């Protein structure tokens, strides 16, 4: 957000959010900041990451075991939860289920909602328009609905965006049931780590924000 960018420009100590927190905050922060959903709402998040997200220990484990897929953090106390709760102004930790699959980098973070979770009566079109308007001036963030998402082979893949600072926020919906999934697709090593650090550095020292990205 513009508020965070301005804070970064004058800060002496800057930390880049964890990759799961990055995806979660990009979805939840606008909803709570603008009052679309109460900060007392019990958010539910599911995510999948490439195995590089676990650092050298998980990379070594995966190279030795070649596990196709696994969940972890099943004590519901993942280390990124305080970041999400603090920056999104939540009263409660989200229910968060992270997972790892057998690919090196890339990730998807999914937020599950219904149309009834919103504070005021709204439509799917208004939700899509809200996110598009909110991020319209953020060149690294693109918002799509499932009416115009082009899915390779018809599948939504977590390793579509790699070696990049880009994020796609995708909105999948069922107008009959009133259910929707708001999803962030990005590179856990890019926007979720090093590329975000470069963007912060550029902002802090007055460089072109996209320099090196």
Model-assigned labels for residue ranges:
Residues 1-67, 72, 172-175, 211-213:
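N-terminal Rossmann-like NAD(P) cofactor-binding subdomain of oxidoreductases
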Residues 36-37, 90, 207:
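Helix N-cap/coil-helix junction residues
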């Amino acid at each position: 957000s513009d508020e965070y960018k301005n804070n970064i420009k004058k800060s002496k100590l800057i930390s880049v959010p964890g990759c799961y927190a990055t995806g979660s905050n990009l979805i939840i922060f606008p909803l709570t900041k603008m009052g679309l959903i109460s900060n007392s709402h019990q958010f539910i998040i599911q995510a999948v990451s490439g195995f590089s997200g676990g650092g050298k220990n998980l990379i070594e484990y995966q190279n030795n075991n070649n596990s196709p897929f696994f969940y972890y953090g099943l004590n519901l106390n993942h280390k990124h939860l305080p970041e999400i709760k603090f920056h999104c102004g939540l009263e409660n930790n989200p229910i968060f289920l992270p997972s790892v699959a057998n690919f090196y980098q890339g990730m998807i973070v999914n937020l599950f909602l219904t149309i009834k979770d919103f504070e005021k009566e709204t439509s799917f079109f208004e939700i899509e328009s809200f996110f598009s308007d909110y991020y319209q001036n953020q060149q690294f963030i693109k918002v799509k609905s499932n009416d115009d998402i082009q899915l390779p082979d018809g599948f939504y893949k977590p390793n579509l965006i790699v070696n990049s600072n880009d994020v796609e926020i995708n909105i999948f919906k069922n107008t009959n049931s009133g259910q929707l999934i708001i999803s962030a697709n990005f590179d856990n090593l890019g926007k979720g780590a090093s590329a975000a650090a470069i963007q912060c550095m550029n902002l802090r020292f007055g460089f072109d924000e996209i320099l090196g990205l």
